[in-house]
Structures are given as structure tokens and as C-alpha cells.
Amino acid sequence: MISANRPIINLDLDLLRTFVAVADLNTFAAAAAAVCRTQSAVSQQMQRLEQLVGKELFARHGRNKLLTEHGIQLLGYARKILRFNDEACSSLMFSNLQGVLTIGASDESADTILPFLLNRVSSVYPKLALDVRVKRNAYMAEMLESQEVDLMVTTHRPSAFKALNLRTSPTHWYCAAEYVLQKGEPIPLVLLDDPSPFRDMVLATLNKADIPWRLAYVASTLPAVRAAVKAGLGVTARPVEMMSPDLRVLSGVDGLPPLPDTEYLLCYDPSSNNELAQVIYQAMESYHNPWQYSPISAPEGDDSLLIERDIE
């Protein structure tokens, strides 16, 4: 039975922030740079955190640090605590921020990463009005450059703007669930018409692998591409978010090469002197995105953080 008089531990936010930095960056050295402390100070902080919670958070095996079961458990709570702390501070600081923020979104991001972004912005800046404009990926950069939009969410990295990676997703080949790809025949492709970064990527990937292809269906909108693939007209390549029960993923077994990952990017034009866009961009830049993938292993000999797993 748990005693009602059991003392409550108040977790130190600085210790939690360093703990999360170590988990995210994999080494004490990298975490030390991120939190502006020395490596020895980070080590001392982690010892203090272990003493505070009364549990071992790291299991030491040589130079490697393994995150224990308790460490993994604390990591989830630490992320939530820091998120709500930072959100509360931002909300109080910018609760009176008003105006209209125009966000341009490519069709790939409209029903994937965009809802996450809108939720984050509206929860921290409740008085801010949001105007969303969805267009083809190829036209987003022009809209940001001409200041038709304040920020843009795109899957094509522009060279002229600052870009923040909101999420990286695998890219797959798709066909209808019952579709049979004929071996020895050119790959029947269902693609957007030009200009389209995805179209360019698909054709470049197939050409590099010396795989013959043909255009089976060319569409002007992403919904039309989805409809054509579901109808069994051919094969397309899109991020993992396109997956649905009436589609199936093709792979190397089907004779198709791997595709580069898709980046969902939040872009901002520093030359626009748009203070509102700058505030939102910087806020997102400092917000930890739990969707991001980060490696959990490191080269041999490095003092990396590894997640301890049960071995059969």
C-alpha cells in the first residue's frame, strides 16, 4: 500500500533539460555544448538527477552509457514536463501577440504535418488569426518570396530561405492493393505534371537504376494521383503518410530501388523583415518535436547514450 505521507519530489527543470539533451544528442559532450555547460558539469548533473529520483538512470558498460528502464521511463515524462513548461512561458510572454499569420502549405503537407503546426501555433498564440493557403509544392517558394505568405510548409528544400525540419518520413512506392506489377515491363508511373520535385526525384531514381518506365497517368493534383493509383492505373512514390488500406507498398523484391526520405520543412524568408513570422519560426525552432527520429547507437568507443533493450 502506498503511504499518503510519502514526500513529493520536485524535479529540477535544468536537470531534466540536460537529461533530455543527452538522450537526444547521444553523447555527454554534445549535450554539454547544447546546454552551454562543460562535460564534467553534465556528468555531475546526471548524478544529481539520479540521487534526486533515487533510481539509476544510466547503466555503465565500459565507455558506453545505457539508459536503464527507469531512465527510459523518466525520459517520456521529462519531455512532457519541459514541453508544458516552455509552452506556459511562451504563452504568457506572447499571449497578446495579435495579427494575421499567412501560412502556405504544399499539398503533401496539408493533411500530414500542417495540423500539428496549426495546433502548436494556435495553442501558444490564441489571439493570432491563421490564414492557410494550399498550393502545389513547386509554387510555394514563389509565394514566400513575393510575401504572399509569411511562412511555408513544404517538402522541397529551398536554397534561398531558412528551413526548419519538422519531420523526416520514409518515401515508398505505392500501388493498388490488388495491383500486380508485370515483371520485365516498363514501370507504369502515376505522377503529377511538371513542375514537381517528386516527379523529378522518381524519374532520377529509376534512371539511375537503369529501370525502364513509362507515364501511365499524369495528374494536376495530388488527390487525382491517389485516385489513379487506387484505380490500378500504375505506381507512384509518396511519403509514408499516403499509406491506406486500399494501397500496398512495393520494394526491392518487386524490382524497385529505395527512395530518399521526405523532409517536411517550415521555411522563413529572413529578408522579408516580417517580425510576426520571425517570432513563430524561432518558437518552432526551439520546440522539441517528438516526431523526429534520432539514432540511438554510436560508433565503437564513443561515450554515447544507448537505450538498453532486453536481449532474448
Swiss-Prot record:
* Classification via Pfam families: HTH_1 (PF00126), LysR_substrate (PF03466)
List the disulfide bonds in this chain.
none
Entry-linked CDD domains: PBP2_LrhA_like
Give the record's keywords alphabetically.
Answer: DNA-binding, Transcription, Transcription regulation
Citing just one GO molecular function, the answer is: DNA binding
Query: What job does the chain carry out?
Result: Not known, does not seem to act on the proton translocating NADH dehydrogenase genes (nuoA-N) which are part of the lrhA operon.
The similarity comment for this entry is: Belongs to the LysR transcriptional regulatory family.
How is this protein named in the record?
Probable HTH-type transcriptional regulator LrhA
Q: Which organism is this protein's natural source?
A: Escherichia coli O157:H7
The major lineage groups are: Bacteria, Pseudomonadati, Pseudomonadota, Gammaproteobacteria, Enterobacterales
